[in-house]
């Protein structure tokens, strides 16, 4: 909080602290020679006593100290996660299990009603072919069988009995 009792966001705090430290460092550079000599003497004295000398923070470390760090989430193995999920499911959803089984009974009957099976082309009464064509000469694709269907006497009719063939043959010969 600042002097007025207002909370300041972390990103503003960091910039303000950096500016203050930069100003201190500039002032410190002027008298740094005297301070360095004073700082080295106590460090040597404390090292002889067996204590660790205090670390002087570098620029990179100072920034890291002021920055917000996020701890990574702990990692669990997949088998542990599955076991935890099963325990959680059994507690809350365990009593719903029988009801869910009953709810699934109506679904297959609805599916049968909504998707009627298409009959084979040979089972359907066909309309007469368009453009005055011959019904015996038709080839039809059947979606149910996934193949082509034709009249049983297709070949004999088209080659031997077709009325148009006789007229075309007579016109071709003359």
UniProtKB/Swiss-Prot annotation:
InterPro entries registered for this protein in UniProt: DUF4637 (IPR029174)
Transmembrane segments: none
Compositional bias per record (Basic and acidic residues), positions renumbered to this chain: 1-31, 52-67
Region Disordered: start-end pairs: 1-69
UniProt protein name: Uncharacterized protein C17orf50
Species classification: Eukaryota, Metazoa, Chordata, Craniata, Vertebrata
